[in-house]
Amino acid sequence: MTTLFIRRAISIRPIHPIQTGSFERGLRLLAAEAAATPTPSSGFSQPPTTNHFFRHWHCIGLSNSVIAGKPFVANIGDLPLVVWRNPANPNSISTTINICKHMGSKLDNAKITETGCLKCQYHGFEYTNTDTVGQTMEHEGKIFWAYNPYRSVPHNIPYYNDPEYKTSHLQFDMDASLIDSALNTMDIRHPEFVHSMGFGSNNPPQNIKQYTYKNTHTHTESLGLSFDYISNGVMRRLNDQTKITQNFHMYVYPTFSWSHVKFNEKSLIIGVNLLPLTKNRTRWFITIAHNYYKSDLGKRIMQGLATTILHQDYAQMRNQATESPLKQAILFDKVFKDEETVVRLRELFQKYQYPDIHMAAELYNAHKQTQDKSI
């Protein structure tokens, strides 16, 4: 078994030999991402001691949800955030904690001044761009937030900016934990049962290859899967009567996943950014990029197909047991063949801690110390 290296930052350990073009595409994407320079530390030698969760980029909303002149509320677990655009410069987006640091009023009803300040309605305290917490970025039609991020930009979705591809976004709240949501995105066995009325086939995936990736600069570990899938009758009509599609799935810990379905010269990419809302509720931000159809009607057809599939996932996610020590003890006592990737993903989540109010308080205390040192 060989180990490949793409730049020094990434080690790639294939579980099986490399044989598919989808995987080679994945390697090129990883190489490009390795070249991205991580954001330098801003006086923060170590992340919050509980875990590094807030240092990863988190999608907190779609771009069209954050409008000029109106505060936007987003929660990352128990961390309450308020986001606003500067009316004078709509490309300037700021974020702070949705608790006024004067006397504790919520800021989601604050006024946004002409100069781009967020003005608390209790006593008139104004938040300028020096009162922000963390970094906020608009990327590929979504709003991302991170505190002292490892990477300078969020991860890219393949082909998103390709002029030959149509793109669209969806948002779904699932009654399931972040862990269950993550495992679902990399599980290639459930479509036969959950998506039998969609793309699911009773023919199991073939030529499964499983891979792991590490980026030491950005403190991320990613998992990859490549496989061939036999289309059912419905999907063959969509896929120009092509019987077999080539597929590549990737999960970038802790909250980002994308999949690539390819046949002939056609490609469909589904990106999923996961946002934990509670311990057992997760928001899925779905990005669709494809060159199946060029028309707006074709774009709506693909959105409708994705919505149908998400409703099927929603029904299963509601049936997941809530997170508990008992569930963790039972999970994967039974493992099917070729499930090394989802088992490894579950192992990655052993270090995950739900971002509860104590972690949020620790983050703010560390932020406050950093601010005090800069004065």
Show where each model-derived region lies.
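N-terminal chloroplast transit peptides
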Residues: 1-18, 22, 34
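Intrinsic-disorder/low-complexity, polar/charged segments enriched in Ser/Thr/Lys/Arg/Asp/Glu/Gln
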Residues: 27, 55-59, 71, 144, ...
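Short Pro/Gly-enriched beta-strand edge/turn motifs at strand-loop
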Residues: 54-59, 67, 129-132, 193-194, ...
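Short, acidic/polar N-cap/turn motifs at the starts of alpha helices
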Residues: 57, 69-73, 80, 133, ...
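Histidine-centered active-site/metal-ligand motif
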Residues: 58, 102, 123, 190-196
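C-terminal catalytic domain of Rieske-type non-heme iron oxygenases
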Residues: 150-375
